[in-house]
Amino acid sequence: MFDTSTKAKTKDLLEGAVSPLAFLKSKLNAGSVVAIGEAHWFSELFEKITEALLAPELDGSFSHLFIEFGNAKHQALLNNYLSGETVTQAELAAVWLDSVAFPAWLHPCYGAFFERVRAVNSTRKVPIKIVLTEPSFSWEDIQHSKELAKLSAQRDQALAEGVEKQTSKCGLGVVVLVGARHILKCSPTLGFMAKHSTFGELAKHKFGEQYVSVWPHILSSELNAPEHGIYPTDQPLLKQRSFLELIPKKPSVNPYAFTCLDELVDAYWYLGPQTRQLDTVGISIPQMWKWRLEQRLPLVNERQQMVIKKVIE
C-alpha cells in the first residue's frame, strides 16, 4: 500500500506534481484525447474534477466532453437545455435515468453537473458540448437482463467510435469522463477475466501517444505526496505499484497481476483522501420517474435493486 506513516523519508515522496489546470491545458492544446477516470458515488471527488474541467482557464482548449452517464437517445434534449432552452428537471432527468447504468447516476451530483455546464456556457467563448455516447435505446424494448448486459457491453466501443469521429473533424483536444476502469490501456493479464476491450485499450490503439489516461485517487488513505496535483506514473514510486493499490475494494484475484501502473494509466490525480457517499437520504427523484425505475428492478442485480428501492421509497 501507499506509505502513510509519518516516518516516511523525503526521498520516498512522489515527485513531479503538475497542477490539474496546467496538465489539462497542455495536453488538450496538443490535441490529446484526455480520459479522466470517474468513481461512482464519490460525489466530492466528482465535483472537484469537474470544477477543474469547467474552469475558465480551459476555455478554448476543448469544446467536446464525452460522458458515460447519459443515453444518446436524449442528445437533442440535452443540447437544447445546455443552449439555454426551457427544459424541466423531470424532462432533463431522462438523460441519466434512461442510461443503461442508471443506478450509478442516482446521486444528485450528476444532474447538477448539467446545470453547472449550462451556467458556464453562458460566459465561455467556446461553449462545452456534452456528448452522450452510450448507445441509443428505449427501456421499453428491454425484456431480459441479458439484453441489458449485452447493451452495456457495447458502451466502450461506442465511446471509442464517438471520440474518433470527433477528433477527425476538429483539431482541439477532447475530454472523456468515464468510469475509472474504462480508461485502462490494457486488458487483464488473466485472460479469462477479459470480457471485452476497454475504452482505454481501444483508444490506445486508435490514438497512440495522443491518448492520455488519468486515474483519480479514490482511497480513504493519504498518498505519500508533498502536494495535491497530477503525477506521472512513469516515476519509480508509482510505476511498480499494483493495480490492487489503486482501488478500495480488493478482488480475490488481481486481474492485472503482471502489469505495471504506467502500462495501465499515464497519470495519477491526487486530491486528498476520498470516500464514497452512499447515503441516499435527501436524494430526490421526480415522481414521474419512480414508477419507471420500479419497473426496471427485475432487470438489474440485487445490489442495484437495493439502491433503487432506497431512492424511490
Regions inferred by a protein language model and the residue ranges of each:
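Compositional signal for N-terminal targeting/processing segments
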Residues: M1-E313
